[in-house]
């Protein structure tokens, strides 16, 4: 079977990704300045504080652009509403998902998406043995993987499906970070499921992607 013809991403996706990446860059820059502020001499503190204030204004402005951009495009707007239905998924995560992997047709299933993000588990091997703890592969999009960490922590408290999974893993004696990794993967399955099926999250209706 011949592979399908390559088609460029829609302009609205490329523009959204640029806006999201710009926010990420400015947030990182602001954090660097905040770190400097803690150790800088008094003579430069005012300048750093002014720069932090400027960066905050820029970040807020671009975030507003992102919201408006999504609202201006029906497909993005509809996907945003679906993602908002998942407990633990907030605005920052939604923006990142829509910008980087909102098109589920690129991935055959949620496991493929997990591998793309670098959160699929793998066994650590020693010589010819594959015994050992399962850990995240750490191969994939580092920024996307980091962006799923905090939502997973929130979901461990408020998302009924992930809370139940956490309880079972805890009772089985699994370590905390393994449970967090499992929560991140489950979040990806939920995200993939609602987008693929075009149905909002419903804990009482277990889709096969959950």
Segments (PLM) and residue ranges:
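Conserved hydrophobic/aromatic pocket- or pore-lining residues that grip, position, or stack substrates
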Residues: 55, 62, 89-90, 113
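Low-complexity, acidic/Ser/Thr- and charged residue-rich accessory regions of DNA metabolism proteins
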Residues: 128-132, 156, 162-210
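Short, amphipathic alpha-helical segments that act as regulatory/interfacial helices
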Residues: 20-23, 27-30, 34, 38, ...
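Long, charge-rich intrinsically disordered scaffolds of nucleic-acid metabolism proteins
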Residues: 1-82
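N-terminal alpha-helical segment
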Residues: 62, 75-79, 90-94, 161-162
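Phosphate-backbone recognition surface of nucleic-acid-processing proteins
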Residues: 84-85, 91, 95-172, 176
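Short, mixed-charge aromatic SLiMs
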Residues: 17-25, 57, 118-124, 170-177, ...
């Amino acid at each position: 079977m011949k592979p399908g013809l390559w088609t460029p991403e829609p302009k609205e996706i490329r523009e959204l990704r640029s806006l999201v990446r710009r926010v990420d860059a400015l947030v990182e820059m602001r954090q660097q300045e905040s770190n400097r502020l803690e150790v800088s001499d008094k003579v430069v503190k005012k300048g750093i504080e002014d720069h932090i204030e400027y960066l905050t204004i820029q970040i807020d402005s671009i975030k507003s652009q992102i919201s408006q951009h999504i609202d201006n495009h029906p497909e993005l707007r509809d996907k945003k509403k679906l993602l908002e239905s998942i407990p633990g998924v907030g605005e920052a995560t939604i923006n990142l998902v829509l910008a980087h992997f909102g098109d589920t047709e690129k991935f055959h299933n949620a496991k493929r998406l997990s591998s793309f993000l670098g959160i699929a588990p793998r066994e650590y091997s020693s010589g010819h043995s594959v015994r050992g703890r399962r850990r995240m592969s750490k191969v994939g999009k580092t920024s996307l993987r980091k962006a799923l960490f905090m939502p997973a922590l929130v979901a461990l408290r408020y998302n009924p499906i992930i809370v139940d999974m956490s309880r079972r893993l805890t009772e089985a004696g699994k370590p905390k970070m393994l449970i967090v990794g499992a929560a991140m993967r489950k979040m990806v399955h939920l995200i993939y499921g609602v987008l693929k099926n075009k149905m909002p999250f419903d804990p009482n209706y277990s889709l096969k992607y959950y």
